[in-house]
Amino acid sequence: MEKKGVVIVTGSCGRIGTQIVKRLASSYSIVGFELLKAIYAAEKEELVPVDLSSDESVHQAFSHIKSMYGKKISSVIHLAAYYSFKDQFSPLYDKITVRGTHRLLEQLKNFEVEQFIFTSTMLVHQPQEPGHPITEDSPLRTDWGYPLSKVQTEKLIHEQRGKIPTVILRVAGVYDDVCHSIPISHQIQRIYEKSLESRLFSGNVHHGASFIHMQDLVDALELCVEKRKSLPEESTLLMGEPKTLSYDQMQKSIARLLGQKEFKTFQLPKLLAKLGAWMQGLLPSDTETFIKPWMVDLADDHYELCIDRAKKLLDWSPKCTLEETLPKMVDALLKDPLQWYKKNGLHMPYSLRRKFQK
């Protein structure tokens, strides 16, 4: 089958990158950009080692592209970025996310590029109250490093894209059937282990956040590539499920699936929550605590999305829902707790680990 063109995927060995490479590989010549050359590249993918923080590394990568594939590029799907819950701010956000994107755009000026897709986040928007969905024109926020870096990068793309058509996808939290979502997996873990923290929350329990299933996101990315010639020169699209489950709904659903029928969550004053998070961080442990003091102020945030623009431009809407997928996540946990913890990067307490290793 003749290929439709060349697609570059930065961060191609990540969770999202791996899935979009699989989806597009039969139709396009895929070139993956990764920090280190992985031992195993995806089938039908060429993997090129690229350090986005290095001018020379990015230049060499595109010299290779030009010599091997020519100057025409159908789409660049830019997934690679810095993200960490460890610190509220980090110089790596600017070094990798912002400056890395600048380096890509500088090199792409030497090519004929039909599309540049940047995966941003719904968190660039200020949270709203329930019943007031966020749109692409809603106010922005820059009060911590992750959304700030995305806002800065979106602005940079607008100013430096030249003639390259661009798509900005403001994506909700991504999950799949095994979970692979940091906040959801930790919430499930706390309830599964019946920890004291599972009963406490420092925010409004009636607030929540939008999420999106991995396959729905991959569908959207594929549609962006396929419809690239009919999209506006600049498009910004929110990507997520329009129905947002509150923290309390999540708590009760997870508890019920784990056989804990009566489950009540108590609101903890923010000052106490910050103090508790700070003290936990001081305790000797072989694993780092998830909740950091600075995260307590985000607990009240509510994200409910209007996805009308994505429906109109891409003819896309989510096929999966978090509500329907939670049972699959918990079922995967109950079938093989050790593997579920491992796949989600969680530390299992020794008492539990000993029980399942017998």
Locations of the language-model features?
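N-terminal Rossmann NAD(P)H-binding glycine-rich loop of SDR-like oxidoreductase domains
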Residues: 6-26
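Mid/C-terminal beta-alpha module of Rossmann-like enzyme folds, strongest
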Residues: 223-291, 307, 323, 327-328, ...
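Glycine-rich Rossmann NAD(P)(H)-binding loop
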Residues: 176, 201-207, 235-245, 255, ...
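Conserved Rossmann-fold NAD(P)-dependent oxidoreductase catalytic core, especially the SDR/UDP-sugar
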Residues: 103-145, 167
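NAD(P)H-binding glycine-rich loop region in Rossmannoid oxidoreductase-like domains
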Residues: 39, 52-99, 107
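Amphipathic terminal alpha-helices
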Residues: 6, 305-313, 317-358
